[in-house]
A protein has these predicted regions:
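Surface-exposed aromatic
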Residues: 70-72, 289-292
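Hydrophobic regular secondary-structure detector
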Residues: 11, 26-36
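Sec-dependent signal peptide recognition
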Residues: 2-10
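Extended, hydrophilic extramembrane loops/domains of integral membrane proteins
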Residues: 58, 283, 290-326
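C-terminal motif of bacterial Sec signal peptides marking the signal peptidase cleavage site
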Residues: 15-18
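Non-transmembrane, solvent-exposed regions of membrane trafficking/translocation machinery
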Residues: 32-284
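Bacterial signal peptide processing site
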Residues: 20-22
Length: 327
């Protein structure tokens, strides 16, 4: 009986050891570099920045191995315990831009033209064969509460403006974003959008009281007032007044001088801070900011805020990346 007990105990221990070994199996990500011209120098710089980001977030035992001219693998057991959103943020290129937002009257005028052209496009193509059938399918499938309004104002039926017109930012339901982007890509629409501006979206989704997700759509200047590796320090913390996560960052001396002049010349105007083309915050400039210190709000939690602060501090990756395999 005693021998049977020891045999049973040995089998049980072996089972737990095997489970432990399986659990410690490293997570492996295969990454594609979205550029055709990847030099050894640019790849080495990419690895250096990624290692710095992992180090700052206390993710250890990272192995990065190049597998082809434009692919590489990242391997670590610690990645198993990290949220996918954190990994996504770490792999962001991290290109920072400061862009002015045009006056709301100008933006609404542009939107009115887009709405009018889109209405005519739908009317002329609704019962005919046309090249971009996917866009029409989207229109037919949209879930709109007021069909009459959607026919007269197809743009404003999915780009919802503030009824009081305090700003010209538009609320876009998560399920409508693809439709809106597809409409904005139509050549008829592109031809009437002024060259000096662009439509873009918020980096972080919001949720209303009913649990519906939506994003903000902004119109910003194409020209950047500041851009590139201009940040020397960034930290994440909880704001004591709002109890929400914030990212505080400091510009380098050159950018701080430029920022001081930019804010002095644009009192009462809005400036958007973008990372990789998406807006994180678009505050009104109340006064000149001579210190070179800025703050970003809106991160979903403190872990996301730390990850964003890390990519700001580590600098811009020389190439954009995408995950093509996760195992």
């Amino acid at each position: 009986m005693k021998n049977f007990f020891y045999i049973y105990l040995s089998i049980l221990l072996l089972f737990f050891v095997n489970c432990s070994n399986q659990n410690s199996k490293p997570k492996k990500l295969t990454i594609q570099i979205l550029d055709t011209n990847v030099t050894d120098n640019s790849f080495n710089r990419l690895v250096e920045i990624l290692n710095e980001r992992f180090y700052q977030l206390e993710i250890e035992d990272i192995k990065i191995q190049r597998t082809s001219s434009n692919t590489f693998q990242i391997e670590s057991a610690e990645l198993l315990n990290k949220d996918d959103d954190i990994i996504r943020i770490i792999l962001k290129r991290g290109f920072v831009e400061f862009k002015l937002i045009p006056e709301k009257e100008y933006v609404i005028n542009v939107m009115n033209k887009v709405d009018s052209v889109l209405r005519n496009w739908i009317a002329s193509n609704y019962e005919e064969n046309f090249e971009d059938e996917s866009s029409l399918d989207v229109y037919q499938q949209m879930e709109l509460t007021d069909k009459d309004f959607s026919r007269e104002h197809p743009f404003f039926s999915i780009a919802l403006l503030d009824p009081q017109f305090r700003v010209a930012d538009a609320f876009v339901r998560e399920q409508d974003r693809d439709s809106l982007e597809r409409f904005l890509r139509l050549s008829e629409i592109q031809n009437i959008i002024p060259e000096e501006i662009q439509f873009t979206f918020s980096a972080i989704s919001q949720v209303d009281n009913e649990g519906n997700k939506f994003e903000m759509m902004y119109v910003v200047n194409k020209h950047s007032e500041l851009s590139g590796d201009i940040i020397i320090d960034a930290t994440a913390s909880i704001d004591p007044s709002s109890e929400a996560p914030v990212i505080n960052f400091t510009l380098n001396s050159y950018a701080a001088d430029q920022w001081s002049n930019i804010t002095a010349e644009n009192i009462h105007k809005r400036i958007a801070i973008l990372i990789d083309g998406l807006v994180y915050i678009a505050p009104v400039v109340r006064t000149r900011i001579p210190s070179g210190r800025c703050q970003i709000e809106g991160a979903e939690n403190i872990d996301d805020a730390r990850a964003i602060a890390t990519i700001l501090k580590s600098g811009t990756l020389p190439h954009s990346l995408t995950v093509i395999k996760d195992e």
